[in-house]
């Protein structure tokens, strides 16, 4: 009979699984990533996988949550550096920081394509509170920072979604993408923030 994993082994295996899932999320995508791929890379059997996660989808949701925390941390850091600036500048810094962090993590396609499909594997309440679309998450962070808008929330959210989806075209636009994105974010915040 196989020996159970020690707590230290469990932690190490769990981290290896998450690391492999991160790799596949940004390269292959969730749908094309098999349980065999994840377990082989982590050095465990398929049956052992279920001692760590009840499904492949829940593993990917956990790394989505980790990435969400990284984006939130980056935005919170940008808030610290924008103390004393007006709300339009603060909002622009927050939105731009969220976009650049998402790009730096390489997770735009994962968030746009895979995360909405994964959200169906969790209860609706939990999906709303944690696994938000990135645009909704950015919008919620602006509200949390007490940024007030001149337009209805639906219009603000749509503007954030349009800006967010532009990240997908970064390679087509080339090296001027981020300076142009910054201009668009600042312009949108000038119009939308009270």
Where are these regions (language model features)?
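Short linear capping/connector segments at secondary-structure termini
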Residues: 111-120
């Amino acid at each position: 009979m196989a020996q159970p994993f020690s707590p230290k082994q469990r932690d190490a295996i769990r981290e290896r699984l998450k690391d492999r899932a991160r790799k596949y999320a940004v390269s292959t995508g969730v749908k094309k990533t098999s349980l065999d791929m994840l377990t082989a890379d982590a050095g465990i059997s398929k049956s052992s996988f279920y001692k760590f996660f009840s499904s492949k989808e829940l593993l990917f949701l956990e790394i989505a949550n980790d990435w969400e925390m990284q984006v939130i941390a980056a935005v919170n850091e940008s808030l610290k550096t924008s103390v004393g600036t007006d709300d339009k500048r603060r909002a622009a810094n927050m939105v731009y920081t969220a976009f650049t962090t998402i790009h730096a993590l390489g997770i735009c396609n994962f968030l746009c394509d895979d995360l909405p499909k994964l959200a169906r594997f969790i209860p609706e309440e939990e999906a709303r509170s944690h696994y938000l679309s990135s645009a909704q998450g950015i919008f919620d962070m602006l509200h949390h920072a007490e940024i007030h808008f001149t337009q209805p929330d639906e219009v603000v959210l749509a503007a954030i979604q349009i800006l967010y989806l532009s990240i997908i075209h970064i390679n087509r636009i080339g090296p001027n993408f981020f300076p142009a994105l910054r201009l668009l974010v600042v312009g949108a915040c000038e119009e939308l923030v009270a």
